């Protein structure tokens, strides 16, 4: 109305204490709205005894949950499965004669008429595996022709020998020489030798070509039988060194001994036997 005075807007600023009181009232109203009655929180029916281990087993939980009452149905696939055509193994054929029963069941796949007298072994797939004869024979970088090696096993353990060459089987051909340390021409594995830094130049030494693995292969000695000869004649055949071995030993050693004598103190070094004494540690020894 024209006679009434218009109300003036409240331009006075509220004090900070009043603002805090208003904010507190609003927060209480929000909390009242948020508070809703809650039920029991969801938890497993199998209480945990220790981390990862429950009180009940899987079979016990199967019965506790009554999972046996559930009906499971396999999902229907949209792709139609092709039905496999069964190949018949037999065929029923009619047979004449009153007393023959009228029919016979005959196999479609006939068995072979004749069988081999001996079983022929069938070759199996090797899956890329090579036979032992075709394995790559790697030689240690420290072992070269003329290197003096220390044998660690066998009857000649501790003795120093001269390395000649590597054979086809991967074994090392070594010699003492025989006159110095009683080690003949023989084979040894590179696992069981220590390569020293001492070397001899054997570039001019001629090693016979027939010194191969078959040359050193151990021959089987004949065992006596009671049928042959007398009953009490039970002496076994003894191993004897062949003349060929003696000739080859002299031919190789004569060439190597000349080169050994040219180096001072090398003969005594090859005669000496390697051994560890107190205070000598193998990992600190320089060979």
Swiss-Prot record:
Q: Where is this cross-link: Glycyl lysine isopeptide (Lys-Gly) (interchain with G-Cter in SUMO2)?
A: 5
Q: Name one GO molecular function term.
A: structural constituent of ribosome
Q: Which UniProt keywords apply?
A: Acetylation, Cytoplasm, Endoplasmic reticulum, Isopeptide bond, Phosphoprotein, Ribonucleoprotein, Ribosomal protein, Ubl conjugation
Gene Ontology CC: one annotated term: cytosolic large ribosomal subunit
Q: Where in the cell is it found?
A: Cytoplasm, Cytosol; Cytoplasm; Rough endoplasmic reticulum
Q: Where is the composition biased (Basic and acidic residues)?
A: 1-25
Record PTM N6-succinyllysine, positions in chain: 93, 206
Leader sequence range is: none
Residue positions where Phosphoserine is found in the record? 126
- Which GO annotations describe the biological process of this protein? cytoplasmic translation
Q: Just give the chief location class.
A: cytoplasm
Summarizing the function annotation, the protein's role is: Component of the large ribosomal subunit. The ribosome is a large ribonucleoprotein complex responsible for the synthesis of proteins in the cell.
Q: Which PANTHER family match?
A: 60S RIBOSOMAL PROTEIN L6, LARGE RIBOSOMAL SUBUNIT PROTEIN EL6
What name appears for this protein in its UniProt entry? Large ribosomal subunit protein eL6
Read off the lineage from the record: Eukaryota, Metazoa, Chordata, Craniata, Vertebrata
